[in-house]
Swiss-Prot record:
Pfam families: Ribosomal_L7Ae
Gene: RPL30
GO CC list: cytosolic large ribosomal subunit; nucleus; postsynaptic density
Keyword Cytoplasm (UniProt): yes
Name this protein carries in UniProt: Large ribosomal subunit protein eL30
Covalent cross-link (Glycyl lysine isopeptide (Lys-Gly) (interchain with G-Cter in SUMO2)), residues: 26
Self-association state and partner proteins as the record states: Component of the large ribosomal subunit.
Family from the record: Belongs to the eukaryotic ribosomal protein eL30 family.
Main subcellular localisation: cytoplasm
Alphabetical UniProt keywords: Acetylation, Cytoplasm, Isopeptide bond, Phosphoprotein, Ribonucleoprotein, Ribosomal protein, Ubl conjugation
Gene Ontology MF terms: RNA binding; structural constituent of ribosome
Sequence positions bearing N6-acetyllysine: 26
Organism expressing this protein natively: Oryctolagus cuniculus (Rabbit)
C-alpha cells in the first residue's frame, strides 16, 4: 500500500509540473515533432506514455541518448498523458523545449531511467 501511495504522489507532482509547462513553457506533442526536436538538439526532456509502441520508444530513446536528452517513462497510458497535458486527445510522445516556470527537468533525473 505504501508503494501505491508513493507512485500516486509522484504521478500528481508530475501532472502538476506538466500543467505548468503547458501554461508557461514551450513543448511539442507527437512522435514526428519530438524526433525532429531531439535531432535538432532543442528538446530538454522527452516524456513517453507507457503504451507507446516498442519500436517508437526504442527509436526515441536511441536519438535521445545520442543528443544527451533525458527520457521519462510516464506511468500512465497515452490517454492519461493527454489529459495531464490538458488536451482532449491522446498523447504518446511529448518533448519539452523550454520548461518555463516549471522545475520538471530538475526534478526528473531521479525518476528518469531505462525500463
Amino acid at each position: 500500500m505504501v508503494a501505491a501511495k508513493k507512485t500516486k504522489k509522484s504521478l500528481e507532482s508530475i501532472n502538476s509540473r506538466l500543467q505548468l509547462v503547458m501554461k508557461s513553457g514551450k513543448y511539442v506533442l507527437g512522435y514526428k515533432q519530438s524526433l525532429k526536436m531531439i535531432r535538432q538538439g532543442k528538446a530538454k526532456l522527452v516524456i513517453l506514455a507507457n503504451n507507446c509502441p516498442a519500436l517508437r520508444k526504442s527509436e526515441i530513446e536511441y536519438y535521445a541518448m545520442l543528443a544527451k536528452t533525458g527520457v521519462h517513462h510516464y506511468s500512465g497510458n497515452n490517454i492519461e498523458l493527454g489529459t495531464a497535458c490538458g488536451k482532449y486527445y491522446r498523447v504518446c510522445t511529448l518533448s519539452i523545449i523550454d520548461p518555463g516556470d516549471s522545475d520538471i527537468i530538475r526534478s526528473m533525473p531521479e525518476q528518469t531511467g531505462e525500463k
